[in-house]
């Protein structure tokens, strides 16, 4: 495997539109700031990865569009508009925008750092699909040697069935999926406490 795309899906840090489950605990403004900080850390790790791995093509896929000033604070990163009605469609569209091998992540999983991404890239050299299972039954990273939209179809998004159903789609396509170490994301107040306590490696 030579070139590989590392795709980051990111929402603009607009108060009230991001990290909504944190709002009751910290307020809309602070929730947006937390989202921006998480995203900045993730993008920073990916930039460090790209500097040490010239085969990496870093892409930031933005929602609702690329116009927010936050996205333009990373001038060396290529910006793209997310497209799709649900998360599955948005992920499929980004992955299938090129036939190159690709790894796709969000911005709210602290354990997905440079070292974690390096491992994902290495495993993707040997397996058609790599997935980072999350504690909540979803996943925080998916990589594919050959991007396929079918893996994202008929999934009950935002439920604890996401990982199981995704693995079923892979099996139906005869794609062996390699599971990376389990991760967690920052969605609720308890996750925020964990992140602030520096528990990203657990």
Regions found by a protein language model. Give the residues of each.
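Conserved alpha/beta core of the MobA/IspD/sugar-nucleotide pyrophosphorylase nucleotidyltransferase superfamily
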Residues: 164-202
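Short, glycine-/small-residue-rich phosphate/pyrophosphate-handling segment
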Residues: 148-169
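Conserved donor-nucleotide/metal-binding helix-loop-beta segment in metal-dependent transferases, i.e.
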Residues: 112-138
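Short phosphate-binding loop-to-helix
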Residues: 69-101, 159-162, 190
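N-terminal nucleotide-binding beta1-loop-alpha1 segment
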Residues: 1-22
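A short, N-terminal amphipathic alpha-helix
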Residues: 33-53
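Acidic donor-binding segment of Leloir-type glycosyltransferases
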Residues: 50-78
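Short aromatic-hydrophobic micro-motifs that form the base-stacking/packing surface
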Residues: 103-105
């Amino acid at each position: 495997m030579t070139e590989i795309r590392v795709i980051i899906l990111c929402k603009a840090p607009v108060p009230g539109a991001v990290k909504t489950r944190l709002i009751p605990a910290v307020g809309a403004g602070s929730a947006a700031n937390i989202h921006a900080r998480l995203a900045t850390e993730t993008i920073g790790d990916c930039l460090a990865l790209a500097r040490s791995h010239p085969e990496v093509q870093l892409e930031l896929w933005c929602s609702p569009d690329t116009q927010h000033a936050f996205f333009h604070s990373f001038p060396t990163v290529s910006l793209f508009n997310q497209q799709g009605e649900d998360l599955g469609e948005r992920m499929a569209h980004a992955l299938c925008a090129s036939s190159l091998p690709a790894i796709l992540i969000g911005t709210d999983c602290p354990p997905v750092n440079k070292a974690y991404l390096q491992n994902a890239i290495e495993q993707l050299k040997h397996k058609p699909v790599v997935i980072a299972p999350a504690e909540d039954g979803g996943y925080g990273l998916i990589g594919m040697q050959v991007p396929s939209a079918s893996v994202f179809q008929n999934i009950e998004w935002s439920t604890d069935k996401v990982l199981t159903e995704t693995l079923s789609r892979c099996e139906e396509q005869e794609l062996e999926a390699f599971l990376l170490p389990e991760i967690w994301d920052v969605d609720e107040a308890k996750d925020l406490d964990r992140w602030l306590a520096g528990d990203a490696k657990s």
